[in-house]
Structure formats: structure tokens, C-alpha cells
């Protein structure tokens, strides 16, 4: 009985600690393929790199799932990546979608993949901001990643354009993330 009560208390504490964590739509649920090869990372990661997918946005799980299947197909079959390049993606519906996932190296920023978590906002944010649902989900996801010990408490948040020649994460999203916790121009 004592062991049961201890287990129950631990379960309740974990629920309270991670209560703010958004649900993550698994790769299996959105119809993604498994990676052809995996390189693992060591947590906690020091950097978070924000991207946009340069695609139309999506507003519900079915639409986002179709978009992700297409992105993964492009990454794996055209760019010869082992998986979709991002660790996680955030849809216009405000849901977090699993990409390469936790503890796995993405293919989103050459030279930075082993030490960063790559988050792709689904859409093109050169002239439009992501939805408020996307932005809120992004902030909550980062808080959750810190709470879970996946990224350092003093993580550095950067836009993809800071570490490689690209417009990503788009002009307006880049401007937005400059107001977020951990943002730096000089990683």
C-alpha cells in the first residue's frame, strides 16, 4: 500500500509539473515515415532555432498532417535527409507536431543540428505573422522543454537566418521572436 501511495504522489507531482505542456501530435498520428537513420543528441540543448516551412499555413489537424507528409517527402526524397528536418513543427491550429522529436538530431541548420532544437512554424511568415494560436503554442512549448530538461534554462533562441543564408523564419516571425525569452542575435 505504501508503494502505491508513493507512486500516486509522484504521478500527481509529474502531472502538475508538466500540466502546462502542450500535447504533441505524434509522427505516427500525422502519417509520417520513420527516420531512415538517427543521430542522437545530449540534453539539455543550449540552442533553439526557429524556422518557417515556407509553405502555405494550415488550420486544422487534417490539413497540417497533409502539409507535414509533403514536407517530409520533400526533405527525405529531394534533399536526401534521414527524416523531416525539424524536431517539432507548430501548426496554425496551435498544435505541436512531432518531427525528428526529442533527443534526435534534426537537419535544419548545418553545423548546429547536434546542439539545437529546430522548431518549424508551418507557413510563410515574410509578410504575415503566425496565428496567435501558433505563437502561444510556441512559447508554451519552450517553457515545457525547459521544465522537462530538454533545453537549458538559459537557452539561446535564434532565427535560422542568424546561422545560415536563408530568409527563415520570415521577416515578421523573426521580428516577433526578438521579444521572446532567450532571444539572441549573437549565438
Curated annotation (Swiss-Prot):
Assigned GO CC terms: extracellular region
Keyword Heme found: no
N-acetylmuramoyl-L-alanine amidase domain ranges (all copies): 43-170
A Pfam family this chain is assigned to: Amidase_2
Residues annotated as transmembrane: none
Keyword set includes Signal: yes
Tissue specificity annotation: Localizes to plasma (at protein level).
GO terms assigned for molecular function: N-acetylmuramoyl-L-alanine amidase activity; peptidoglycan binding; zinc ion binding
Primary subcellular site in the record, as a coarse category: secreted
GO terms of biological process kind: innate immune response; peptidoglycan catabolic process
Disulphide linkage map: 21-144, 58-64
Subcellular location: Secreted
UniProtKB keywords: Disulfide bond, Immunity, Innate immunity, Secreted, Signal
Signal peptide: 1-19
Function statement: Peptidoglycan-recognition protein probably involved in innate immunity by binding to peptidoglycans (PGN) of bacteria and activating the prophenoloxidase (proPO) cascade immune response. Binds to 1,3-beta-D-glucan and PGN.
Family indicated by similarity: Belongs to the N-acetylmuramoyl-L-alanine amidase 2 family.
Protein name: Peptidoglycan-recognition protein 2
Gene it is expressed from: PGRP-2
